[in-house]
């Protein structure tokens, strides 16, 4: 974990601890495992709250299949359904691409000048849980209306020159519509 990622987690955790009522005006999403057939079992929630430093993203997830870092993004559409791509179905394809209202078409990470939907990587512990808050400094709760949050199978490298077309975080594994 980079020093920047650790610092963001520390700031987010401090803000959440100091202001537990901050979620009164926030948003949340219940995440489900997604397949080519649609949504399956729930794996918990992610809460979103504004702070003076940006958007605090607080996961309360369990029973995740893969440990380590996972790319996490805000996607353009409030739909986690599968879509057909050629001869197969893409889990979560209806969520569209990363939220990119300025149409930068750049995958520069949460601190760069690309997609606004790029969030810091989610940390999944050995027991399959993810509870470490992160900070998305360029987003606010008001940006989240009509969107979905997606957790991918692999860590995001925030690189437009990778060899994977699913946002550099691997296949889509978990999705939730933000409310």
Regions found by a protein language model. Give the residues of each.
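N-terminal leader/targeting pre-sequences
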Residues: 2, 18-179
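Sec-dependent N-terminal signal peptides
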Residues: 10-12, 17-19
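Bacterial N-terminal signal peptides that target proteins for export
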Residues: 1-11
């Amino acid at each position: 974990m980079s020093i920047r990622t650790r610092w963001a987690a520390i700031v987010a955790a401090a803000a959440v601890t100091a202001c537990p009522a901050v979620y009164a005006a926030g948003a949340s999403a219940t995440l489900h495992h997604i397949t080519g057939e649609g949504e399956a079992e729930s794996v918990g929630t992610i809460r979103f709250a504004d702070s003076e430093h940006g958007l605090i993203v607080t996961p309360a997830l369990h029973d995740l299949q893969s440990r380590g870092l996972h790319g996490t993004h805000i996607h353009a559409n409030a739909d986690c359904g599968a879509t057909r791509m050629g001869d197969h179905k893409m889990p979560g394809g209806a969520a569209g691409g990363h939220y990119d209202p300025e149409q930068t078409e750049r995958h520069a990470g949460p601190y760069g000048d690309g997609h606004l939907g790029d969030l810091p990587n989610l940390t999944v512990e050995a027991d399959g849980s993810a509870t470490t808050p992160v900070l998305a400094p360029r987003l606010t709760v008001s940006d989240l209306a009509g969107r979905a949050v997606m957790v991918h199978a692999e860590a995001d490298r925030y690189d437009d020159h990778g060899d994977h077309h699913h946002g550099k975080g691997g296949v889509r594994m978990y999705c939730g519509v933000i409310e």
